[in-house]
From Swiss-Prot:
This is RNA-binding protein PNO1. Keywords: Acetylation, Nucleus, RNA-binding. The modification N-acetylmethionine is found at M1. GO terms for molecular function: RNA binding. Its main location: nucleus. CDD domains: KH-I_PNO1_rpt1, KH-I_PNO1_rpt2. One of its GO terms (biological process) is ribosomal small subunit biogenesis. The gene is PNO1. It comes from Homo sapiens (Human). SUPFAM superfamilies: Eukaryotic type KH-domain (KH-domain type I) (SSF54791).
């Protein structure tokens, strides 16, 4: 036995480590509690130092409109289909005047590319002028009257929305024609009623429907048109949109 103990001690001296029995569950639990307590103390100290030393946020000065417009000239191009050449030519001065005089932009009709081109210049003061002018011309190209499309320049909360009848219901042939007829009504009565109740403007161009108005009003008009496409009778649609319009009027 003594010789065995001597060999073990010699091995330990040579570099071998002795294996000792690990502690039980209680010892492990006690050790974990000590580590967690030390960690919480460290976190608390770290939080105290962070609160004492607040992070500095960078402060940038606000950009002015002149600074945004001082860069390169911006251009918008609106393609014109063949069926809108004549109306564009007849109403060119009504389109040209507000864009040039009120918004301070430059506009021309490119005969080669068949596009209406609008660009900024030194006289442009408003950052959003180019977008307003492009929406105005686009609304006229889609079929709206100049007086109705002009509201896109005067008011900020007006939008354009377009969708196809076949997006609501995949109709073909006579079924599609009947759906278009239900939206328009006899002599345009149904379309005019929806426009007056929802305070919007609607253009029916073949299978496409274009709506001009505020967000809430566009939503009401779109719901009414979708119900007509799905086959609801006009009298029921009238009642629904009048009820919704009266509720929204009371709310505001």
């Amino acid at each position: 036995m003594e010789s065995e103990m001597e060999t073990q001690s010699a091995r330990a001296e040579e570099g071998f480590t002795q294996v000792t029995r690990k502690g039980g569950r209680r010892a492990k639990k006690r050790q974990a509690e000590q580590l967690s307590a030390a960690g919480e103390g460290g976190d608390a100290g770290r939080m105290d130092t962070e609160e004492a030393r607040p992070a500095k946020r960078p402060v940038f000065p606000p950009l002015c409109g002149d600074g945004l417009l001082s860069g390169k000239e911006e251009t918008r191009k609106i393609p014109v289909p063949a069926n809108r050449y004549t109306p564009l030519k007849e109403n060119w001065m009504k389109i040209f005047t507000p864009i040039v005089e009120h918004l301070g932009l430059q506009i021309r009709f490119n005969l080669k590319s068949r596009n209406v081109e609008i660009r900024t210049c030194k006289e442009t003061k408003d950052v959003s002028a180019l977008t307003k002018a492009a929406d105005f011309v686009k609304a006229f190209i889609l079929g709206f009257q100049v007086e109705d499309a002009l509201a896109l320049i005067r008011l900020d909360d007006l939008f354009l929305e377009s969708f196809e009848i076949t997006d609501v219901k995949p109709l073909k042939g006579d079924h599609l024609s009947r759906a278009i007829g239900r939206i328009a009504g006899k002599g345009g009565k149904t379309k005019f009623t929806i426009e007056n109740v929802t305070r919007t403007r609607i253009v029916l161009a073949d299978v496409k429907v274009h709506i001009l108005g505020s967000f809430q009003n566009i939503k009401m008009a779109r719901t009414a048109i979708c119900n007509l496409i799905l086959g609801n009778p006009p009298s029921k649609v009238y009642g629904n949109i009048r009820a919704v319009a009266s509720r929204s009027a009371d709310r505001f």
